[in-house]
Curated annotation (Swiss-Prot):
Single Gene Ontology MF annotation: ion channel inhibitor activity
Coiled-coil parts of chain: none
Disulfide bonds: 48-62, 55-66, 61-71
Protein name listed in UniProt: Conotoxin VnMKLT2-021
Domain comment quoted from the record: The presence of a 'disulfide through disulfide knot' structurally defines this protein as a knottin.
Any one GO CC term of the record: extracellular region
Pfam family, one: Conotoxin
Residues making up the propeptide: 23-45
Organism, scientific name: Conus ventricosus (Mediterranean cone)
Leader sequence residues: 1-22
Tissues of expression: Expressed by the venom duct.
Length: 72
């Protein structure tokens, strides 16, 4: 009987922890929607740099050619 009560209390406690964590996570998503969205970081939404623009690596240029930090 005591073990059953302890198990029930433990399950209720863990359920409450799960619900409060989920609620705070959802609130954080609403406060900072850009942190949860990976659309801006995906390759489909990234734009490439045109010729003459400042670059830092070859893959950021449309031509895939970055020399002396300038796209060619």
């Amino acid at each position: 009987m005591k073990l059953t009560c302890v198990l029930i209390v433990a399950v209720l406690f863990l359920t409450a922890c799960q619900l409060t964590t989920a609620a705070s996570y959802a609130r954080s998503e609403r406060e900072h929607p850009d942190l949860g969205s990976s659309d801006q970081n995906s390759k489909l939404t990234k734009r490439c740099l045109a010729s003459g623009e400042t670059c830092w690596r070859d893959t950021s240029c449309c031509s895939f050619s970055c020399t002396n930090n300038v796209c060619f």
